[in-house]
Structures are given as structure tokens and as C-alpha cells.
Amino acid sequence: QMDSFIELLRERGSWNDERIQWMITQDVEDELAIGRELLKRCISYAAGFRRREIPSSRLVVGLKCGGSDGLSGLTANPLVGAFSDDLIAQGGSTILTEVPEMFGAETILMNRAADRTVYGKIVSLINSFKEYFIRHNQTVYENPSPGNKKGGISTLEDKSLGCTQKSGDAPVADVIRYGQVIRTPGLNLLQ
């Protein structure tokens, strides 16, 4: 996968070696030590910048799975959703990722589509992922991991409802492809 990432960077043109650091964990003896060293380099690079205030409307935050259990849908995920709604109310944007996490609760997001075009994009997004699973002989509705189940998640719907709570109550503004820049402020779903 790292080769693909490096190739993507090369296709996009040059990059700043001080700003972008990476390691291939299989190629290093002690990934914690190397990781710390890479972080030190990033911190040193960042120290050269001056902080300044910018409006919240320029902030984009990704909402990713943090490990679901029986309490995350009651505690952390609603809090993240409230943050998302607050940021969006200030003109900022959030991106809800991990489409398979949405399976089982996708209609909640469909019902919040900003318009018919966005609704169609959400339907296409969900169906494309389900078709991908089917083409590769994967079970669509068996997403909870053993760890999720041990933590109290009993069904895909339990897990999916937790996922959708991270998006708050804002309308879904758009669906974007991986690597695409947000065109519409607000809640975006990532392909």
C-alpha cells in the first residue's frame, strides 16, 4: 500500500520532505522509535510557522471510526455529532468516512440529503459499496468485529447507528470521492 501512496504523491508532483514523513512498519526494527523520530522532525518543521487565527469556516474535520462498543453510541459519538453540528453552523465542514460503517443506518443519511442530487449520490455511494462486497464474496451485513461484540455491539445496526450519530443532525451537503477537495461546505460523505 505504501508503494501506491508514494506513487500517488509522485503523480501529484513534488512534495516537501520536511512536511511529509512516512515509514513502512514491515521494513523497520522498532516502529515506535522510528515513529517518534519522524514526529520530532514534523514538530521541528512546524515550529518554524507562526500561528494565526482563522475563521471556523475554513476548518474541515474528518469523522472516523474510533472503535465502537456498547457505550460509544451513547457517549462519544453524540458528542462528536454535536461538535460537527456546531462547526457546520459556523460555516465549517465535516467529512463522515467509512461507508461500510453506515450499512444498516444509511436511510438516516439519505433522509438528510440537502437535495435530490445529493440523495442520489448517497444511494449510489451505499449501493456501490454493497455491490463491491458482493463481487468479492464478502458478507454485507456482518460488519461488527469480535471486539465490537465483546464491547456490547450485537448487530450491524447498533454499530451503524453509532457511526451516523457522529454526523450530528446537519443535512448531508455532498458526497465526495477519495482525494477530492470539498466543494460544498457542511457535512460531506467520503466515498
Question: Model-found features: residue ranges?
Answer:
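Glycine-rich phosphate/diphosphate-binding loops that line cofactor/substrate pockets in enzymes
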Residues: 50-60
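Glycine/charged-rich beta-loop-alpha catalytic/anionic-binding loops adjacent to active sites
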Residues: 19-25, 65, 183-185
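Short amphipathic alpha-helices and their capping/turn segments at secondary-structure boundaries
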Residues: 46-52, 82-85
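Anaerobic metallocofactor- and corrinoid-dependent redox/one-carbon enzyme cores
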Residues: 31, 58, 63, 69-191
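Active-site cavity-forming subdomains of large catalytic enzyme subunits
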Residues: 1-50
